[in-house]
């Protein structure tokens, strides 16, 4: 008795199936032993259980920021809820605002965690670097604002000069 054996490469067998997981049942030698499962096949089995392993949770991601930098106006809203006020430093260096936050390793519900980040923002033209202010809300949002540079008074003509 002769048993037919498929000699197609596995990638061709998978590509030629009408729909993944719905290929016609084949013979014993047509099955993909030892090849593992494709990611799509795993997700079809239990998509909700696998999603946390492939997607980074927003609470673990880097802080998010909303930045508004128009000429003469500067505003940053930065989510720093994982840091205490003592762990956050805001300083002006030249025409940049630098934000640094860090906390040492400490226990949390999953083990131990340490966090640190650095952000640097260029001040737009027309903004006074000496007028940069920052405030931390109770929700953990750091607000950094900068006022426009004071307008220079127009030069006055010397007394006795004729106006044209």
Swiss-Prot record:
Subcellular location: Cytoplasm; Nucleus; Secreted
Listed GO biological process terms: negative regulation of apoptotic process; protein refolding; response to heat
Keyword Ion transport in record: no
Predominant cellular place of this UniProt entry's protein: cytoplasm
Domain sHSP: start-end pairs: 56-163
Processing after translation: Phosphorylated at Ser-16 by PKA and probably PKD1K; required to protect cardiomyocytes from apoptosis.
One Gene Ontology term of the molecular function aspect: structural constituent of eye lens
Sequence positions bearing Deamidated glutamine: 66
Entry superkingdom: Eukaryota
Modification sites for Phosphoserine: 16, 157
Record GO cellular component, one term: nucleus
UniProt key word Nucleotide-binding: no
Chain intervals for the UniProt region annotation (Involved in stabilization of the HSPB1:HSBP6 heterodimer): 1-72
This protein's UniProt keywords: Chaperone, Cytoplasm, Nucleus, Phosphoprotein, Secreted, Stress response
Homology family: Belongs to the small heat shock protein (HSP20) family.
The protein's assembly and partners: Homodimer. Small heat shock proteins form high molecular mass oligomers containing variable number of monomers; these oligomers display a very flexible quaternary structure easily exchanging their subunits. Heterooligomer with HSPB1; formed through oligomerization of HSPB1:HSBP6 dimers; subunit exchange leads to formation of at least two different heterooligomeric complexes, differing in variable quantities of HSPB1 and HSPB6 homodimers in addition to HSPB1:HSPB6 heterodimers.
Descriptive protein name: Heat shock protein beta-6
């Amino acid at each position: 008795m002769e048993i037919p054996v498929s000699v197609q490469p596995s990638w061709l067998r998978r590509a030629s199936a009408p729909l993944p997981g719905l290929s016609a049942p084949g013979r014993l030698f047509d099955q993909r032993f030892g090849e593992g499962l494709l990611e799509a096949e795993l997700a079809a089995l239990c998509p909700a259980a696998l999603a946390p392993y492939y997607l980074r949770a927003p609470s673990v991601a880097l802080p998010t920021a909303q930045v508004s930098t128009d000429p003469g106006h500067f505003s940053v809203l930065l989510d720093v809820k994982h840091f205490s006020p003592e762990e956050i430093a805001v300083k002006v260096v030249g025409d940049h605002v630098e934000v640094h936050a860090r906390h040492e390793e400490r226990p949390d519900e999953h083990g131990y965690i340490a966090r640190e980040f650095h952000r640097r923002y260029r001040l737009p033209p027309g903004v006074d670097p000496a007028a940069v202010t920052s405030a931390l809300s109770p929700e953990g949002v750091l607000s950094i604002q900068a006022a426009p540079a004071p307008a220079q008074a127009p030069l006055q003509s010397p007394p006795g000069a004729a106006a044209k």
